[in-house]
Amino acid sequence: MAKNKLLVVEDDAGLQKQLRWSLDAYEVVVANDRESAMAQLRRHQPAVATMDLGLPPDPDGATEGLALLQQILAASPDTKVIILSGNQERAHALKAIAMGAYDFHQKPLDADTLSLVIARAFYLHAIQQENRRMLQIQSDSRWAR
């Protein structure tokens, strides 16, 4: 059975490695900036993504991360985006939720908790896809009468 694809957007190589190791139940696709994240999103079409808001060229701010969130949700509205946030970024994480992010997880990361949040995001995505499919079948059967 194929593993679910998870996009991890993180510019810290050490954290990328930690996430790849701790999330080995998924096919982890990594990006380290907005451009590579969008390329990976188009190429792999992951159902779930985790992302740091502090991405280059603004690693200490959130402008690049919030812009990427907006792009991801515009290109793939069903993708569940989980924000990985440091304590000083809490206000930015809440803004990201208001913009449409699925959830956020505080750094430093707790692998078990993050795994549960990610599993829940994949589950919700699958339920929403199934619901859409059933609504389409129902709609098609009305027209077939």
Where do the protein language model's features map onto the residues?
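Active-site beta3 strand of CheY-like receiver
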Residues: 44-55
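Alpha4-beta5-alpha5 switch/output surface of CheY-like receiver
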Residues: 64, 89-92
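Two-component/phosphorelay signaling modules centered on CheY-like receiver
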Residues: 12-35, 43
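Short amphipathic alpha-helix used as the core "switch/output" element in two-component signaling
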Residues: 39, 58-78
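C-terminal output helix
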Residues: 91, 105, 109-118, 126
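Flexible nucleotide-interacting loop at or near the entrance of a catalytic core
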Residues: 116-145
